[in-house]
């Protein structure tokens, strides 16, 4: 048995069914022989994104795996891996390396060294008979505590080394979580009960812990409104009366106003990272309760009054029991009053945006595309993701995600084009869902040729390209350069590219045809075809920013 065969047997025991990859790597042939489906991407960063999206939707119960060749293959994967690292996504990365006899030669790229700052752990297999121990450590670290990408480098001579089958003594690893200190929870629970205007901030830790039901129960016990971070979007049902919406660089008005008036802010499953894109800023003067599974989050950017360490589901259950012991059941009148306060803010805010959401202008306003999409697609049946820049800023405040993992939020590391790989991975994880990524023409230019991967590999996603032939999100930063050299101008017919790559594609220029085009595209995906809709849109650059 060769080392690569042993690795593939371990992958099978861990439930891995496909291997996102790009040659050359001996693992690809070994995986196919072992019955693991190789999915060949067109560019390594997208291949990582496929594994990333898969891991997010499965909450790490099945870990996405990506393998690539040494040198340029590993180098091309960098932005995909940094996205997974910044968003704490459990991934297993298996790059080939040079043979041990030459791996230390100057100028040879070493994945384990280069990726150390943007992975949870890196390790090289130095002895073939240690493959089980190395892979056991790798799978343990992907999901234990704060999840993250783990990289195992495989020297070329080790990859094909013969080992004894007795060396393959591998049992799938078990995940474990821990609760919080009971005294810490009791003290924080009393603070929450005494608060006049508490607000809950939920992060993606709630999603990975599969704790949305507990979060709803806690919110109703406290009559506390809930906002999520961008990565945490869908952790709390956004159609719930206590939902404020997603708090990020753009947000609905209720998020901004309720945070401003809060006396206590309870962060659960979030890192409280001060980041202009993914999280609403916490105003000064608040009492902060912070529950996280990573001690590095505590006091990172905000001074924490009540730090709590533990798994989000376990911690929420502890809070619920503590509150019931003190208070009993929830108060419907208080819940109703808070919900009414949210409506009083949300309705006029939404009314201000209705001219754009219902616009009949040509080129089509991108907000009209989003509005029509929300009308004709049941969000419970879909998984949606944005891309960087305008599509994210336009989609996030208005699209309501009602169920866990019905939206993939990302952007701590916000490389253009990331959404395409993520949505392919989501479709592989949840083939019954209508999986859609919204991207701009700039993002399509970065990764759009991997639409062919979706076509070739029978991954029937819908890619919506909002094409304004312009880099609109950077307008305020590029005035002089654009006036003199047209630096924001772009061009291209992306529906023609989609058809040329073998997919179903259509270009839409009439706002009255938006809804019917979306329905046609959905039917194409239901018939097993990857679909691309190109909407010719205006250079809309107004976003629902608060506090500017």
Positions of predicted regions on the chain:
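N-terminal alpha/beta PP-like core and its mobile active-site loop of ThDP/TPP-dependent enzymes
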Residues: 1-330, 376, 453, 460-463, ...
């Amino acid at each position: 048995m060769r080392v690569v065969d042993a690795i593939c047997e371990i992958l099978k025991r861990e439930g891995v069914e496909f291997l996102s990859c790009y040659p050359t790597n001996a693992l690809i042939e070994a995986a196919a022989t072992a019955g693991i489906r190789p999915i060949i991407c067109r560019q390594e960063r997208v291949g990582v994104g496929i594994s990333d999206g898969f891991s997010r939707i499965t909450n790490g119960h099945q870990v996405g795996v990506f393998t690539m060749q040494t040198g340029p293959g590993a180098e091309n994967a960098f932005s995909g891996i940094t996205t997974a690292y910044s968003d704490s996504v459990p991934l297993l990365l298996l790059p080939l390396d040079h043979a041990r006899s030459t791996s230390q030669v100057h100028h040879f790229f070493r994945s384990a060294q280069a990726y150390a700052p943007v992975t949870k752990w890196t390790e090289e297999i130095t002895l073939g008979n240690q493959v089980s121990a190395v892979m056991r450590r790798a799978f343990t670290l992907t999901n234990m505590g704060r999840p993250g990408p783990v990289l195992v480098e495989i020297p070329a001579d080790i990859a094909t080394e013969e080992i004894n089958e007795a060396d393959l003594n591998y049992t799938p690893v078990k995940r474990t979580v821990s609760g919080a200190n009971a005294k810490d929870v009791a003290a924080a629970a009393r603070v929450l009960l005494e608060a006049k205007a508490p607000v809950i901030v939920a992060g993606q830790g709630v999603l990975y812990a599969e704790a949305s039901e507990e979060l709803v129960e806690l919110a109703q016990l406290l009559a506390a409104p809930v906002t999520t971070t961008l990565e945490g979007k869908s952790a709390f049902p956004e159609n719930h009366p206590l939902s404020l919406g997603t708090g990020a660089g753009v947000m609905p008005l209720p998020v901004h106003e309720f945070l401003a008036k809060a006396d206590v802010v309870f962060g659960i499953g979030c890192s409280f990272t001060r980041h202009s894109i993914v999280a609403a800023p916490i105003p000064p003067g608040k009492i902060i309760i912070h529950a996280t599974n990573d001690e590095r989050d505590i006091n990172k950017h905000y001074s924490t009054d009540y730090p709590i360490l533990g798994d989000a589901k376990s911690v929420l259950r502890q809070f619920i029991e503590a509150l019931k012991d003190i208070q009993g059941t929830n108060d419907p009148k208080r819940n109703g009053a808070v919900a009414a306060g949210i409506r009083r803010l949300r309705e006029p805010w939404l009314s201000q945006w209705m001219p754009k959401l219902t616009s009949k202008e040509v080129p089509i306003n991108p907000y009209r595309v989003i509005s029509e999409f929300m009308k004709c697609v049941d969000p419970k049946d879909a998984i949606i993701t944005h891309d960087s820049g305008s599509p994210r800023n336009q989609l996030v405040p208005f699209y309501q995600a009602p169920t866990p993992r019905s939206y993939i939020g990302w952007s701590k590391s916000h490389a253009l084009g990331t959404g395409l790989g993520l949505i392919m991975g989501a479709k592989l994880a949840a083939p019954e869902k209508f999986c859609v990524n919204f991207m701009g023409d700039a993002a399509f230019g970065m990764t759009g040729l991997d639409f062919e991967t979706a076509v070739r590999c029978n991954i029937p996603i819908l890619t919506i390209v909002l094409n304004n032939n312009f880099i609109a999100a950077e307008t305020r930063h590029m005035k002089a350069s654009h006036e003199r050299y047209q630096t924001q101008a772009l061009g291209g017919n992306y529906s023609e590219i989609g058809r040329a790559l073998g997919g179903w594609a259509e270009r839409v220029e009439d706002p009255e045809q938006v809804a019917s085009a979306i329905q046609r595209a959905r039917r194409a995906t239901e018939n097993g075809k990857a679909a691309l809709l190109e909407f010719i849109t205006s250079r809309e650059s107004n976003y629902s920013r608060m506090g500017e």
